[in-house]
A protein has these predicted regions:
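Conserved loop->alpha-helix
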Residues: 1-158
């Protein structure tokens, strides 16, 4: 469980792909102890299990299902990934509870800048619209945001 407040990121160092899965290696400035092997990490909103730790490099296994539903299908070496360690008892919750169970990807359809506010519109398949509520929470690339408006197959955050 995460809260969607992202303070850290990692860069994609290596991607190994097979027919049904991939392994990704991220370089990060976060410190991971060997005891955190097997722990969950919010990576761009997807709950992934740490499979290897080597100093500042961490590895993850991505199943065919994960690749089909997340933006990891588009990831390339050098890309930056939002990362957040899982919540611990007593942690402050500033965003909303983020489980990291991703249903689909949306695409940016428009960005409007009004004074100091950005309104970002996303195009979403109609089948997933039923899961959205105006003023409800959504995690986009792991970041906790509030849905400001829903219309047809588009939703907005700002």
């Amino acid at each position: 469980m995460f809260n969607g407040i992202i303070y850290n990121s990692g860069s994609v160092e290596k991607i190994s792909t097979s027919k049904n899965s991939s392994e990704i290696i991220l370089k990060t400035n976060l410190i991971f102890k060997k005891s955190e092997l097997g722990s969950s990490l919010n990576c761009n909103g997807t709950c992934l299990t740490i499979t290897k730790i080597n100093k500042n490099l961490i590895s993850f296994y991505l199943s065919k299902e994960t690749l089909s539903k997340t933006n990891f299908k588009f990831i390339k070496i050098g890309n930056i990934v939002n990362i957040e360690k899982s919540l611990s008892y007593g942690n402050k919750i500033s965003g909303h509870y983020v489980q990291g169970h991703v249903d689909t990807c949306a695409s940016v359809s428009a960005i409007k800048v009004l004074d100091k506010t950005w309104i970002i519109s996303f195009l979403l398949k109609k089948i997933f619209q039923k899961n959205l509520i105006e003023k409800g929470s959504i995690a986009i690339n792991g970041v906790s945001l509030t849905i400001s408006r829903i219309k047809k197959n588009i939703f907005e955050v700002n």
